[in-house]
C-alpha cells in the first residue's frame, strides 16, 4: 500500500512554516493518541502522523522528501550500497580497500544498544519520577565467563579458517582470477571452534535474562525525547564493553493542559457577567490553584501569562510559563427572569457592540459597501 503525502497527512501546505507543522502535529497527535482515541485505526493514524512530523520537522529529511518523496533515489542502482553488486564489491575491496582490511574476529567488540519505550502520565513527565523497569537482554554467561566452552576446556582455533574468521575463495572475473574473502560459515566469523560446549549457554557465551534497572526520569522530559543509560545494553563480545540502553518516552495527553516545549496552555470558561464586570478567579496550575484577576471588559480569546508556572526545563534552564486563554460561555438555557433582564440590558445599551469594537464594525460596514 502506497504511503500518503506527508503534507496531506498533517493537513498543511508545502510552504508551511516549522511552527505550523508543529501546531498541526500537536493537534492530530492529541486527536489520534491511542490512550484517548479508542477507534480501531487510531494507533495507525497516530503512527502515520508521527512519521510525517519526524520527516517534515527535520530540515535535512524535509529537503530530501521534497525532492524525492517516498521514493528511494538509489533504488535504480540496486537499492544503494556496494554489497548489492555481488562479487564486484569484493573486487573493489581488493583494489581500493573497501572492506576495511582484515579484522581480528577475537578482538573485543561493544555489545548492541537496546531501546525501551516508557509511557508516562502528563504530570510524571513534568515533575519526573524514579521507577524500575524490567528488560530482556543478553548477558555474559557466568558458567563459562563468556567463552562458550565447558568449564575446564577452551575454545580451539577453527580448523577451516585457521582462526581468522574468513575464508579465501578464488573466483574468475573479467579482471582475471581474484581472491574473495568471505566470512567463515563454519565458525560464523568467530575464528573459534568449541568442541565441548557450555551446558548453560549452549556454546553462545551469552544467556538471555530479564534485568531490573532503576531509572530516574528527569523533570521536564517531553514526548518523543530519550535518555541514555550507558552500559545497560547487550553484553559485549570477547570481553568488550556492554552496549547502551536508550529509553524513549511516550507522554499521555492531559485533559485540561496542553504543552508546547516548557510552556503550558489551558482554556478557562467564563460567563458574560464575569468578563463584563471583571472578576477574580482560581486557575488550576501544575502546582495547585492560583488566583487570577480578570479585568472588566475582557474579550473572549484574551490570553493571560502566569510566569514560572510552566514545565521545568529538562536541562535545568529555568521554568516555562502557563498561558490562560479566556473562553466566554454563552448560556443555552435561561429562565424567563434572566431573559427579561437581558432584554432590559439590550435596550439600555442600545443593542450595539461596545465602543472599543467600533473600529472593527466600521471595517465590516465598509466591506459591505465595497
Swiss-Prot record:
Ranges occupied by CXXCXGXG motif repeats: 141-148, 158-165, 184-191, 198-205
Cofactor (UniProt): Zn(2+)
SMART domains, per database record: DnaJ
A GO term from the CC aspect: cytoplasm
Pfam families: DnaJ (PF00226), DnaJ_C (PF01556), DnaJ_CXXCXGXG (PF00684)
Gene Ontology BP, a term: protein refolding
Subunit structure: Homodimer.
Free-text note regarding domains: The J domain is necessary and sufficient to stimulate DnaK ATPase activity. Zinc center 1 plays an important role in the autonomous, DnaK-independent chaperone activity of DnaJ. Zinc center 2 is essential for interaction with DnaK and for DnaJ activity.
Database matches in HAMAP family: DnaJ
Entry protein name: Chaperone protein DnaJ
Source organism (scientific name): Halalkalibacterium halodurans (strain ATCC BAA-125 / DSM 18197 / FERM 7344 / JCM 9153 / C-125)
Higher taxonomy: Bacteria, Bacillati, Bacillota, Bacilli, Bacillales
Amino acid at each position: 500500500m502506497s504511503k500518503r503525502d506527508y503534507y496531506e497527512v498533517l493537513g498543511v501546505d508545502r510552504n508551511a512554516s516549522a511552527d505550523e507543522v508543529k501546531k498541526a502535529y500537536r493537534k492530530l497527535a492529541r486527536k489520534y493518541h491511542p490512550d484517548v482515541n479508542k477507534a480501531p485505526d487510531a494507533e495507525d493514524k497516530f503512527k502515520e502522523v508521527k512519521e510525517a512530523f519526524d520527516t517534515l520537522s527535520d530540515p535535512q529529511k524535509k529537503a530530501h522528501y521534497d525532492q524525492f518523496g517516498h521514493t528511494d533515489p538509489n533504488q535504480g542502482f540496486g537499492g544503494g550500497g556496494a554489497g548489492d553488486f555481488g562479487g564486484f564489491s569484493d573486487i573493489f575491496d581488493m583494489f581500493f580497500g573497501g572492506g576495511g582490511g582484515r579484522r581480528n574476529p577475537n578482538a573485543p567488540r561493544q555489545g548492541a544498544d537496546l531501546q525501551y519505550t516508557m509511557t508516562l502520565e502528563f504530570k510524571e513527565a513534568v515533575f519526573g519520577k524514579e521507577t524500575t523497569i524490567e528488560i530482556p537482554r543478553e548477558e555474559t554467561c557466568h558458567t563459562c565467563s563468556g567463552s562458550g566452552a565447558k568449564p575446564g576446556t577452551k575454545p580451539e582455533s577453527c580448523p577451516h579458517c585457521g582462526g581468522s574468521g574468513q575464508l579465501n575463495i578464488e573466483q574468475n572475473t573479467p579482471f582475471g582470477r581474484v581472491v574473495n574473502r568471505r566470512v567463515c560459515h563454519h565458525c560464523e566469523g568467530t575464528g573459534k571452534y568449541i568442541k565441548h560446549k557450555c551446558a548453560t549457554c549452549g556454546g553462545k557465551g551469552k544467556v538471555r535474562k530479564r534485568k531490573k534497572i532503576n531509572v530516574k526520569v528527569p523533570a521536564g522530559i517531553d514526548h518523543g525525547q530519550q535518555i541514555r543509560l550507558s552500559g545497560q545494553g547487550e553484553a559485549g563480545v570477547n570481553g568488550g564493553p556492554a552496549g547502551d540502553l536508550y529509553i524513549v518516552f511516550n507522554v499521555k495527553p492531559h485533559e485540561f493542559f496542553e504543552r508546547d516545549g516548557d510552556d503550558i496552555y489551558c482554556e478557562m470558561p467564563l460567563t458574560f457577567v464575569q468578563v463584563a464586570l471583571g472578576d477574580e478567579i482560581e486557575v488550576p496550575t501544575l502546582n495547585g490553584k492560583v488566583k487570577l484577576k480578570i479585568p472588566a471588559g475582557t474579550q473572549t480569546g484574551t490570553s493571560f501569562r502566569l510566569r514560572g508556572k510552566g514545565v521545568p526545563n529538562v536541562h535545568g534552564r529555568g521554568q516555562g510559563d502557563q498561558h490562560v486563554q479566556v473562553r466566554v460561555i454563552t448560556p443555552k438555557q435561561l429562565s424567563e427572569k434572566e431573559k427579561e433582564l437581558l432584554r432590559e440590558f439590550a435596550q439600555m445599551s442600545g443593542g450595539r457592540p461596545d465602543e472599543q469594537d467600533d473600529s472593527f464594525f466600521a471595517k465590516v460596514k465598509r466591506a459591505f459597501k465595497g
